[in-house]
Amino acid sequence: MDNRVSPQNSLVSVQDLSFSRGNKKIFDDISLEFERGKVTAIMGPSGTGKTTLLKLIGGQLFPEQGSITVDGLNVHRLRRSELYDLRKRMGMLFQSGALLTDMSVFDNVAFPLREHTHLPESMIRTLVLMKLQAVGLRGARNLMPNELSGGMARRIALARAIALDPMMIMYDEPFTGQDPISKGALVHLIKSLNTILGLTSIIVSHDVQETAAIADYIYVISEGKIVGQGTPKEIEQSDSDWVQQFMTGAADGPAHFHYPAKDYVDDLLSTSKRY
């Protein structure tokens, strides 16, 4: 059964995308669809360009060829003011959390509201408390970032990401560096916020278990190509050796354990003085 996402149902559509850094081809003519109201995951090993894809979707980088549309708008043809308006509708949870260290939890969440709206402080207070309540940290509003655990900081960053009620959120490695309890809390939050707020979520991750638990659809990327795509169940049953190696964490396979080198015995017996 083919469960591929129809472009008609997509909030974000990536068509025939190619992108390089220097001589390294990051994406080679790939196409992806991100369905409205769903959680879509981009998976693959480190260095495959997952975070780069988020930057391309956000208009921070320009593709060599292809197009990216968000809510029907071609991201890379927008004027600066139009791109600015679009970005206000796109929440972002950075891998680092990126909290402003000299601001309290409350002021971190209030920051986008103060920057991008003309709401009175009384309404901003109400909205901030609502967002903090949603992530379970309303009682931490007066703490400073250096008083937070890693999991708490990630949840505060999520509250800030939804402050402007975006249509979508992009998550850059949300589970990295988190303990099992924090991972479980983030899994619950991402799924529940997506459902309750009607969000479209894009998750970049190499954490297989957590991501598969909440994703509606998964793309697996390697060496610039999509090597697997489908529902978590379809990915689990994929006959691709590469997908199976990634999902099971096997040490060797299509992604080799050894970095390319000349023959081992020849290398040992070589009389060359160069390493």
Regions found by a protein language model. Name each.
Residues 58:
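Helix-to-loop junction immediately C-terminal to a conserved catalytic motif
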Residues 73-74, 121-139:
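Conserved ABC ATPase "signature" region
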Residues 248-275:
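ABC ATPase nucleotide-binding domains
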Residues 144-148, 152:
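Conserved ABC ATPase signature
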Residues 169-172:
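Catalytic Walker B motif of ABC-type/P-loop ATPase nucleotide-binding domains
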Residues 163-167:
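A short, proline-enriched helix->beta-strand linker immediately N-terminal to the Walker B motif
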